[in-house]
Amino acid sequence: MLILTRRIGESVIIGDDIKITVLGVKGNQVRLGIDAPKDISVHREEIYERIQQEKLAQSEDQGEKTDEFE
């Protein structure tokens, strides 16, 4: 894991087209601004995990439906 130190207003560039800027720090929370192309999904980790669980459940449901027709 790469660890970087940034101050408010400073940024990190990922690849050629993703920019993450530190907007603020308050207590143990950091506000980040993320500039990325529209075709790049950006989610908080807990939201991403929920999306992955929903996709897994849907694929399992599809598998059960396929089994019924065999």
From Swiss-Prot:
Keyword match Cytoplasm: yes
Location in the cell: Cytoplasm
Any one of the GO CC terms: cytosol
Pfam families (UniProt xref): CsrA
InterPro entries: CsrA (IPR003751), CsrA_sf (IPR036107)
Listed GO biological process terms: mRNA catabolic process; negative regulation of translational initiation; positive regulation of translational initiation; regulation of carbohydrate metabolic process
Superkingdom in the source lineage: Bacteria
Keywords: Activator, Cytoplasm, Repressor, RNA-binding, Translation regulation
GO MF terms held by the record: mRNA 5'-UTR binding
NCBIfam families documented for this protein: csrA, PRK01712.1
HAMAP family: CsrA
Subunit text: Homodimer; the beta-strands of each monomer intercalate to form a hydrophobic core, while the alpha-helices form wings that extend away from the core.
Similarity-based family: Belongs to the CsrA/RsmA family.
Its job: A key translational regulator that binds mRNA to regulate translation initiation and/or mRNA stability. Mediates global changes in gene expression, shifting from rapid growth to stress survival by linking envelope stress, the stringent response and the catabolite repression systems. Usually binds in the 5'-UTR; binding at or near the Shine-Dalgarno sequence prevents ribosome-binding, repressing translation, binding elsewhere in the 5'-UTR can activate translation and/or stabilize the mRNA. Its function is antagonized by small RNA(s).
UniProt-recorded name of the protein: Translational regulator CsrA 2
Organism in which the protein naturally occurs: Coxiella burnetii (strain RSA 493 / Nine Mile phase I)
Lineage: Bacteria, Pseudomonadati, Pseudomonadota, Gammaproteobacteria, Legionellales
Gene this chain is encoded by: csrA2
